[in-house]
Each structure stands twice: as C-alpha cells, then as structure tokens.
Amino acid sequence: MKSLTLIPGQLSLSQLRDIYSHPVNITLDSGAFAAIDESVACVNAILAEGRTAYGINTGFGLLAQTRISTEDLENLQRSLVLSHAAGVGEPLDDDLARLIMVLKINSLSRGFSGIRLSVIQALIGLVNAGVTPWIPAKGSVGASGDLAPLAHMSLTLLGEGKARVRGGDWLPATEALRQVGLEPITLAAKEGLALLNGTQASTAFALRGLFEAEDLFASAVVCGALTTEAALGSRRPFDARIHEVRGQRGQIDAAALYRHLLTDDSAISQSHHNCSKVQDPYSLRCQPQVMGACLTQIRQAAEVLLAEANAVSDNPLVFAAENDVISGGNFHAEPVAMAADNIALAIAEIGSLSERRIALMMDSHMSQLPPFLVKNGGVNSGFMIAQVTAAALASENKALSHPHSVDSLPTSANQEDHVSMAPAAGRRLWAMAENTRGVLAVEWLAAAQGLDMREGLTTSPLLEEARHLLRERVPHYTQDRYFAPDIDNAIALLAARHLTRLLPAVLH
C-alpha cells in the first residue's frame, strides 16, 4: 500500500492517478490543523453570538429561511445526511469511492468548511482501513454539489447504510466499522453540509475518464504507427517542420510521438522509400493534426480537473480571518461538466480515426494487403466483421459525445434552477472509453496481421515490441476462427496499459 502525506490543495495528477489505481494510506500534514481549527472556532462564535448563517443554523435549499434552534443542530446534520442519501443504481467500485473520499478530505482540509479535524480524520480512517461506502452511481445533477453520492459516503461515518472492507461483501456500515476497529461519529453544526456539498463525485468521475483518455491516446498513437507501417504509409507527414510552422502545441507533440515510434531502422519503411505514391489517405497522413487536437483537449481538461481536485467547493464558506461566512456557488460543477464534454470529444475522435485506419487496411487497393487481411478470401472472411464491430463502437460514441453541460433541469422547487449535469458527463466517459478500447483492439490485431503479411520485413524496435506483445496472446490469423476471444485478449492488454508504456506520459 502506498503512503501519502496530504498537503491540502497540492495534489498532482500523478498522485490522483495513484489514489484511483491503488489502495493508499493517508496522513494529513500537520500544517493544515490550524486553519481547520480556526474555521471551527468561527462557526462556534457565530452560534455563541446568536447570528443566523446559512447551513449552520438554518434549513437548506428552499428551506434556507427557516431558523433552526440550538438544541436541534446535531439532529439537523444527521437528518441532512439521511434524507439526502437518495441515490440509485449500482454502487461505485472501490477505486472510485476511494478517490471521492480523498478529494473530499483534500477540500475539507483547506480550512474553509467549519468541520472538525476529528471528522476529517474519521474519513481518513475509512480510506486507510480500506472501507468502501455503498455509493450508488446515479442521483446527482452536479449542483448543489454531489449531494446524493456524498450523503451515501457520509452515511458510513454515522454507522448507517452499507459498506464493505477491502473488496469483501457488503455489510451494514456498523459491522464494517467494527471489523476495522472504527466507531460511528456524531456531526456538529455545519459538518453534515460540509460533507455533502462539493463536486468531489463529479470530479472523480471525470478524472477516471481523463485517465482513460490519456491511456487511449497513447495506445492509439502506437496503433496508428503500426498501421502506417502495415499499409506502407509515408513518414514524411510526421516531419517536425510541418508541425512547427502551424504552431499548435498538441500537434507538435503528437508528431514527435509518432517519430519516436517510426524510426529509420524499419526495414518496412526502407522497402518503399522511393515508391511513386504521392500522398496517403487522411487517416494516415493527418494523424498528428487529429491526435494533436485530441491531446490539446485532454490537456486542457486535465488542467481544469486538477484545479477542481484541489478546490474548496463547499457552501457556505468560512473565512475565519474575517470572522465571516459567505454563501456562494462553488458547488456548481459546470467547469467539470465542460471538461468532461471535451474529454468525450477526444475519446470519440480517437476511436473514429482508428476505425478509418482499420477500414483502410481492409481495402486491398489502399493497403496493398490481401482483402480483409486473410489469404484464400471467399472461403475465409478474415477481419470483415471485426471492422464492422469497430464501426459500431465508433458510431455509438458519436451519440455519447453529445455535450451534457448544455443540459439543465431545475431542482429544489426552482431554488436550484440551473445545474451542470457533470456526474452524467463524467460517467458516460467510461462507456466511451470501453468502446474506443474495443476499436483500438481491432486495429492492433489488424495492424499486426498486416505487418505479418509483409513477409521478411520488420518495423522499428518499439513497434516490433508492440507486435510481439500481441503475438504472445494472439496467434497470426491463417484461416477463419472464433474471433471474439482475440479481440478480448487485445482489449485486456490495452486495459493493462501495455502499449501506453511504449510512450512517455502526455499529461505530466
């Protein structure tokens, strides 16, 4: 298990990926304690002075004008968590739940939420003990924060709802806490709202999509380079001079990645160096331009999501230095929704371009390979239907890439009359990534088959490694066989990031 000393507001993308990918043991940096304590003191001072402050001694949403008596404040926070735990759908997996909890810890520890250190430490205790709250996937519109999923997360702290320990069976939360030696807690004024208000679920959903997009981008560059070799494509379109004069950073960097793979020691490239072909189709020739645009979208989304991962998205906010509590709208996840929409465009385009390269290899006039990449065509259908599968997946992503951030539906009796739909924007990225991974799997299989058919010729060392990785699991296609297991094997290799490792990281 990895250890992380959490300095509030300073998580990096690589740390966020690690938190999502592996169990983690968190220690909160002691430098955060003073600001946390000062924000609690500010809340207590407001109560002692008899002042009215939203979320501290009032109702919520349309009931914000209702003043709550001092003796009901603890019950108010408990009731808030219970009533807002109204999500539906399958529970989030351990990795996503852990990321949500760490994002919430990071935000609360900034010291603007009026929540006690002991409550934050209780949430850290869940993470360190491997306790996963039952968090249904659906039920948030991304404003006022991710109320339902964060309420389900918070139930476990109270000993309510369901949870599991290190991937075990779902249990009553009290039993899960007992197994790891933890006790339920009681919330004080403001603390229930601090736990529930925020964009942590939306941000975690989109971050998962971002990590998927980064991996898909790298895998697609490798697959595209393999196809370029298999189809006897030209290296000239990757010349750095072309991309420097345009000045698009994503395109420049993408072209460099292709050059990293398409090195001069390729016998295939040398075999057609002086051929008469003037131009390649766009799906080969314009890879740096299209993939560079995708890289730019991914990077811009990463910048937004990194800021949000380190943000304070609670409401109201406690500014202890000024003894002030201000009700605002940092819970509105519009930046996350728009970032997720941009990631969706990139994932869709990565798959769309890959599908076109697959189609190119099926066409013997374009690729100079046997039709559908198989000998004795007619008796054998080869990759014919595998390309159809890729087309189906790429087409489905076109519909899924419709922007969610332009959608809104009023809630809470029109008090919350514009919402972001960020959770849905992030959640659909997972299905899109699965589709694009399927397309890339077919391309990898097809490109390896095409390279095999360039008998006696090898490609560059890195691309030979990519071919070898596949051939360890999937043999050369000599005649028709049950095809689905081959695609599944390629998908598994892609999901394990085997091709991603052939390139440097593109986000950090």
UniProtKB/Swiss-Prot annotation:
Where mainly located? cytoplasm
* EC number(s) recorded for this UniProt protein: 4.3.1.3
List the GO biological process terms.
L-histidine catabolic process to glutamate and formamide; L-histidine catabolic process to glutamate and formate
* NCBIfam families, per the entry: hutH, PRK09367.1
Q: Which reaction does it catalyse?
A: L-histidine = trans-urocanate + NH4(+)
Top-level EC class, please? lyase
**Source species:** Klebsiella pneumoniae subsp. pneumoniae (strain ATCC 700721 / MGH 78578)
Question: Which molecular function term from Gene Ontology is one that the record holds?
Answer: histidine ammonia-lyase activity
Pathway membership of this protein?
Amino-acid degradation; L-histidine degradation into L-glutamate; N-formimidoyl-L-glutamate from L-histidine: step 1/3
Residue numbers of 2,3-didehydroalanine (Ser) PTMs? S144
- To which protein family does this belong? Belongs to the PAL/histidase family.
Annotated keywords: Cytoplasm, Histidine metabolism, Lyase
The subcellular location is: Cytoplasm
Instruction: Recount the PTM note.
Output: Contains an active site 4-methylidene-imidazol-5-one (MIO), which is formed autocatalytically by cyclization and dehydration of residues Ala-Ser-Gly.
What's a GO cellular component annotated to this UniProt protein?
cytoplasm
Positions bearing the 5-imidazolinone (Ala-Gly) cross-link: A143-G145
Q: What is this protein called?
A: Histidine ammonia-lyase
